[in-house]
Amino acid sequence: MTNTEIFNKLTNAIVTQDIAGCAKLTQEALDAGISPLDIITKGLSPGMKIIGDKFEAAEIFLPQIMMSGKAMSSAMEILTPELEKTKVEGEEGTGLAITFVAEGDIHDIGHRLVTTMLGANGFDILDLGVDVLNETVIEEAAKRKGQKIILVGSALMTTSMLGQKDLMDRLREENLRDSVKCMFGGAPVSDKWIDEIGADATAENAAEAAKVALNVMK
């Protein structure tokens, strides 16, 4: 198979919730000399984008999301050790990434991928998990005031995305906004939304998220 064929098959494995097939293809891609980063950005992430768009359009529902998540996890179990081997040591003081999925949202597929990529690019990680209250994010940021921090929030649903605006408002109320950078992602998040709520950045996929985060923290 050509690399393009492998990437297309990986994308399809995510979309069709083929857990065993996704793991097998991931190993085959590594054996063919394809980098973990390319496997993620050109094979797995496009599949997750399709899944996110289908969920937003109500074409699929939670069970399918969960199964696609398991397919992604089967791939990441293979890729994470490889990413660790090639971990980029960030410049001194790259910073701490506090990652979380918005309150009311338990879809952690993209979140886990972004967290992995941030760690692989030199960030220290504090992963708060899924269905995280804005109050919890505020508390964790306040504890570390004075450190270099970027908040990285995910939301797959429009309803949970709206909580990002509340978080930005709370950061300003608590005089924490100037202490942290804020990046949000997920299927419904757009550049227009980021501008509207006064956040710093968004990204199309996990690999881009790591690059954007590094740029924002300069």
UniProtKB/Swiss-Prot annotation:
Gene3D superfamilies: Cobalamin-binding domain, Methionine synthase domain. One of its GO terms (molecular function) is cobalamin binding. It holds the Pfam family B12-binding. Keywords: Cobalt, Metal-binding, Methanogenesis, Repeat. This is Monomethylamine corrinoid protein 2. It comes from Methanosarcina mazei (strain ATCC BAA-159 / DSM 3647 / Goe1 / Go1 / JCM 11833 / OCM 88). The keyword Repeat applies. GO terms for biological process: homocysteine metabolic process; methanogenesis; tetrahydrofolate metabolic process. The keyword Lyase does not apply. Pathway: One-carbon metabolism; methanogenesis from methylamine. Belongs to the methylamine corrinoid protein family. Acts as a methyl group carrier between MtmB and MtbA. The gene is mtmC2.
